[in-house]
């Protein structure tokens, strides 16, 4: 609220219009709102995500194929949100016998972030909250989840062992323990690297997605300077914490009340401009695609 509340600005944050395994869909019912500042990560005209059910099936297929061959599945993931979403998929799939019961190793801040989700289940999706509160069934505490706390020695032991799944930060392969896992597992042709999140332009994750197999390690964890990737590279869309183009349009279409102005932010330049233009044409509202440090006066 600005001043006495005569002008009201809503910030979408990272918004997902539909329910996910972890959270209920975004709330877009407000007492008053004049301007909406909305993310545009997948706001491009061709940014449509795969249905989550299809995405889960593809992930399970990659896991089945890789573990059957004796390999390891390495999943770079954001510590908050994405990792817990994937954990729920893995726990259910193993419980139902849809994928082999192999260890799932959690590295980086994933364990700590998951503990926060477990501590505050009242903020989670309704049915997940009920499982934890009323059924005394916490999927995040399943036996297959293992916290990596032994450093490089433990990672090397796992890399030398049998089939497993590794969830590790950072989600865009820009540092963190994922670099160590690439060093240990990257040369294994029977293993798979699976992207389940957005890879921004300029990140190492995006370069690997685009076909790079000679990875500069920059003295992070590999004295050789570069690493040759022999792993299978897979991308599974549909797990993003961001709504796709249709979801963003639906968020505004069903918003109550509908804002007078929309500032499209947090996206590649083309995505921001595409979404801003689409909102203007579809809803006849004032829309903007701000540049960095551009200033707006609300009145």
What is each residue range found by the language model?
Residues 1-85, 89-98, 103:
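His/Asp/Glu-rich metal-coordinating catalytic cores
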Residues 1-24, 154-159, 165, 177-181, ...:
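Core dinuclear metal-dependent hydrolase active-site scaffold
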Residues 10-15, 37-41, 76-78, 106-108, ...:
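Active-site neighborhood of phospho(di)ester-bond hydrolases with catalytic His/Asp-centered motifs
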Residues 21-41, 122-128, 199-228:
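Short, compositionally biased "basic patch" segments
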Residues 28-32, 99, 184-189, 253-258:
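Short, conserved loop/helix-junction motifs that constitute active-site signature segments
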Residues 59-204, 219-221, 280-281:
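Hard-cation-handling environments
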Residues 217-252:
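Generic long, charged, amphipathic alpha-helical segments
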Residues 250-280, 285:
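C-terminal structured "cap/appendage" subdomains that terminate the fold
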């Amino acid at each position: 609220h600005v001043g006495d509340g005569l002008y009201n600005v809503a910030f979408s944050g990272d918004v997902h219009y539909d329910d996910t395994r972890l959270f209920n869909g975004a709330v877009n019912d407000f007492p008053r709102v004049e301007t909406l500042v909305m993310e545009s990560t997948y706001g491009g005209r061709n940014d449509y995500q795969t249905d989550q059910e299809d995405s889960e099936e593809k992930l399970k297929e990659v896991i089945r194929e890789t573990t059957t061959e004796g390999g390891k599945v390495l999943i770079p993931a954001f510590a908050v949100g994405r990792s817990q979403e994937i954990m729920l998929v893995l726990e259910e799939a193993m419980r139902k016998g849809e994928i082999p019961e192999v260890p799932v190793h959690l590295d980086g801040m994933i364990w700590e972030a998951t503990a926060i989700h477990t501590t505050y289940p009242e903020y989670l999706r309704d049915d997940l909250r009920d499982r934890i509160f009323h059924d005394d069934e916490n999927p995040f505490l399943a036996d297959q989840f293992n916290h990596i706390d032994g450093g490089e020695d433990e990672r090397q032991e796992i890399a030398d062992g049998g089939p497993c799944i590794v969830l590790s930060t950072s989600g865009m392969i820009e540092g963190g323990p994922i670099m160590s896992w690439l060093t240990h597992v990257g040369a294994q042709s029977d293993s798979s690297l699976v992207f389940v999140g957005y890879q921004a332009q300029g990140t190492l994750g995006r370069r690997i997605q685009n076909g790079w197999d000679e990875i500069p390690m920059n003295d992070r964890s590999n004295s050789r300077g570069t690493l040759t990737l022999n792993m299978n590279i897979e991308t599974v869309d549909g797990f993003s914490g961001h709504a796709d183009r249709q979801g963003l349009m639906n968020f505004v279409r069903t918003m109550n009340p509908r804002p007078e102005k929309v500032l499209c932010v947090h996206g590649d330049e083309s995505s921001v401009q595409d979404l801003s233009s689409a909102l203007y044409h579809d809803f006849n509202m004032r829309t903007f695609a701000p540049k960095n440090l551009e200033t707006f006066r609300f009145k």
